[in-house]
Amino acid sequence: VLGNTFHLWLRPGLDVIARHGGLHRFMNWSGPILTDSGGFQVWSLGDLRKISEEGVVFQSPVNGDRLFLSPEESMRIQRVLNSDIAMVFDECTPYPATRNEAALSMELSLRWARRSRVAFDAEDLGGGVVDALRESPSDAAADAANQAAGRPSNGLFGIVQGGVFEDLRERSLECLLEIGFEGYALGGLSVGEPKEEMLRILSHMGTRLPTNRPRYVMGVGTPEDLVEAVSQGIDMFDCVMPTRNARNGWLFTRHGDLKIRNARFKDDLLPIDPECTCPACSPESHGDDRAPFTRAYLHHLQRTNEMLGASLATLHNLHFYMQMMREMREAILRGRFEAWRRDFSGARGQGIE
């Protein structure tokens, strides 16, 4: 899961998370956790922030306090959060931006990336684990170093910026590779640019990212976006879409998207997707002998703003995304990705019954 460094820093604050020993115990989650650097949230504050070489001064959206965030402070906060993957502090290049504006922003992000790397290593977030990951991409090497060091594996990912300019993106990646990171992300996508521009940069940069490190696209996207990105070699994604859309009654299915608030579903006795095995569509698949929740019931819950409606929709959408990614991994292993992709696209275009 992804932890939002900026918001966790403000609420509940680092003290309470530190007393738990980090996010894993705080949220009772034993799986991997990635934390962003806070850069995107600071960028989104607009007029409430002021950027300099040292970092960003901004006004807290919670209580109006004047706060300062820098590469070093971001690394310190992420150390307290104790995530498995930390992200460098960067400036998200806005759209639209001139080539000169994008270049200046990208160069600032590179200087901040170097400072993030130094601060990350000095904070001993990774120690021997980071060194082992640099020398070998194998899990065994990382696990051995982790065991010897007596601490969890942690890694720092670099973020490629440069807006919609391919040569700037290439320079950003080249410099990040010189610094050296445990993984590489494409940032500054899906920030208002046309879909064609996003796909062009993704196509240009996806296969240029190193194949012996995790490749991550930040803030993307629709099911179709993820399929396209995987075809370009991308491994990891984060996006609010499955959960935010769920809260608004927008459900993803194998045969297209379903807007459960629409009147046509008021009396519909089918589950969201009869082929789905999520807890909402198929409780029996999860040891529950109840019948599936019907579209009519989900329609009622959404229309009356009942919390259960958002919860069931979220479970469904997350299950859909996880199942889609699982199928893509299996198709790649079997050498059938393109065939799977055609079938998936065809089914998604059929529409909901």
Segments predicted by a language model, with ranges:
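Glycine-rich phosphate/ribose-binding loops and adjacent secondary-structure elements
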Residues: 107-110, 119, 123-133, 138-146, ...
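C-terminal extensions of enzymes
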Residues: 90-96, 273-353
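Conserved, mostly hydrophobic/aromatic
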Residues: 1, 36, 78, 158, ...
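Short, solvent-exposed loop/turn segments at secondary-structure junctions
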Residues: 7-9, 40-41, 93-94, 163-165, ...
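Alpha-helical packing segments of well-folded alpha/beta enzyme cores
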Residues: 74, 105, 109-112, 116, ...
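Glycine- and acidic
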Residues: 94-99, 103, 183-189, 307-310
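Non-catalytic, usually N-terminal nucleic-acid engagement modules in DNA/RNA processing proteins
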Residues: 2-130, 139-147, 257-258, 263-266
